[in-house]
Amino acid sequence: MDTSGMKIREVEAALFPADGTEVSQDLIEACRLDARQGVARLVRRYEREQAERERVAALYAYENAAADEGYELVAGVDEAGRGPLAGPVSVAAVILPRGLFLPKLNDSKKISANVREELYDEIQEKAIAVSSVLVDAKTIDRVNIYQATMNGMYEAIFGLDPAPQKVLIDAVH
């Protein structure tokens, strides 16, 4: 395959098909051999996007294993804002459709406020179920941060409708 006769927009359409079909290795190799800077930029973008897809796919490893065991409704639970000095703890439980790709998905502490907002909106729109709980500082002071977080996780899980068949918890032991 030779891409030198293609316009940059045609190369872009081939590398990033609107219908999400898989791109052939022949096309990728042909693009790598294309001397045009515009095509080189597209190849770098393609490689970045593929690396991000692989990173996010690795996050779903436990969920996929649960699905392979026959569980259809798998919830993920996590907290943010931990710390008795920092104020309340927010806990959320979410059941996402299998195979949903959320680019930029990462630990909330590792992403910007803008990305968190974008992900929040997309999760609210596409999730099968979402439940969130805010554990206040008084509760944290009364029972300790670990117990307050665990209680918040249970409350968030029991707030899901439909109820999950399996729960994956990101917790400190």
What are these regions (language model features)?
Residues M1-A75, L85-S90, V94-H173:
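Acidic (Asp/Glu) carboxylate-rich active-site/surface patches
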Residues D78:
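Substrate/ligand-engaging "lid" and interaction regions
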Residues G81-R82:
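Short active-site segment of divalent metal-dependent hydrolases/proteases
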